[in-house]
């Protein structure tokens, strides 16, 4: 069975070190790739209704089984509205509500977590669902848990023992604005715990984290823990034998909002 998770895309903010035109070109390039992947899949999973996680078009999903975050339970007002709009577009599809559910397609089992906070407890961003796919290997896609800031979510990941872990990391590009240094400390602590206690083959640490060219310095304790233990902690770009665009952009075009910074050490916070 061919599965696509969260087929959506959004343009980066101006803190991303690539000119607007180049960012638009990248969006166009990867949106075409995403659309082709959806056309070629059997099952599409949508963990929540932010537009970087789904394209709200009906025709795109024709004939696909849709496994989606519940559109009415554990959902904020904005996403509830988007979910209703999306469901109106895909009425003819076979639809399953994902929250805390389990389905099997041939030899592939897809399990979903209970609704998880999109960041800190009580956040206005609402909830997402994590995805566990089991076949020859176990893959855990956390969706947007923003860190994780919440230790319970780190423990859940450790207990699942995935071979491949895809995790979004903290939104450090919002550090000192929407994201606090205390939450960065929690995220680093929880990521280190996951690295130390999970015998994964690969951990893809990406999404929110890779919007900030300082990411390796801010999370150096996580990367150093991985290196010390021989764990493969990499970005999605590196998994595909490419260099992260945020680093390439910084090298080519220079800094945006962060001109200087230091490595972040949690014991000083």
Where are these regions (language model features)?
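Active-site environment of divalent metal-dependent phosphoester hydrolases
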Residues: 49-55, 73-76, 146-151, 171-176, ...
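Short, solvent-exposed loop/turn segments at secondary-structure boundaries
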Residues: 122, 154, 177-181
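A short acidic, amphipathic alpha-helical/loop segment
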Residues: 56-59, 152-157, 218
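Core dinuclear metal-dependent hydrolase active-site scaffold
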Residues: 1-39, 84-152, 244-247, 251-269
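Active-site metal-binding motif and surrounding structural segment of the metallo-beta-lactamase
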Residues: 19-69, 159-166, 173
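P-loop/Walker A phosphate-binding loop and immediately adjacent motor/lid segment at beta-alpha junctions
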Residues: 1-3, 12-14, 56-77, 181-182, ...
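Binuclear metal-ion centers of metallo-dependent hydrolases, dominated by the metallo-beta-lactamase
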Residues: 99, 183-269
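Active-site neighborhood of phospho(di)ester-bond hydrolases with catalytic His/Asp-centered motifs
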Residues: 4-8, 41-52, 68-69, 140-145, ...
